[in-house]
Amino acid sequence: MFNCLTKLVILVCLKYVAKALLNRSTGLIMKDKPEGVHHIKSCSDSSSRIWYSLWMNIAFCGGLGPTSIFDPCFLTSSAPSPPSAPALAIPAAAPPLPTSVPAGAGVEAGAGAETVSSSLMIFSSFFLYN
């Protein structure tokens, strides 16, 4: 139905829309360093790391690339190094996710942008294979 060039143009447009929504919803700071590496505000923010890694995989590898290559905390020289642990150590449980939205949070705080951006990411990855 669509030729390759049309798919590429639509994918590039989706990339910019999803990038803007991700910046708004997860607080990512996309700054180009001289070597072209992007970084985020906090490497300890697991939500930002997951969204950023997922988006980078879809945008640059069609969802097939290894996540660690595009992990900003993996790429940035200022990233904290993980603590050394025995090989059979069980990782600590993640903190529970908040179940309610704080009072006053609304559109200005990026409400709903995460859902839209995740839908765009899923659509763009599906679109690559059709």
Curated annotation (Swiss-Prot):
Q: Other notes on this protein?
A: Almost completely overlaps SFL1.
UniProt entry keywords in alphabetical sequence: Signal
Task: Write down what this protein is called.
Answer: Putative uncharacterized protein YOR139C
Q: Is Signal among the key words of this record?
A: yes
Tell me the leader sequence span: 1-20
Q: Which domain of life is it from?
A: Eukaryota
Organism whose genome encodes this protein: Saccharomyces cerevisiae (strain ATCC 204508 / S288c)
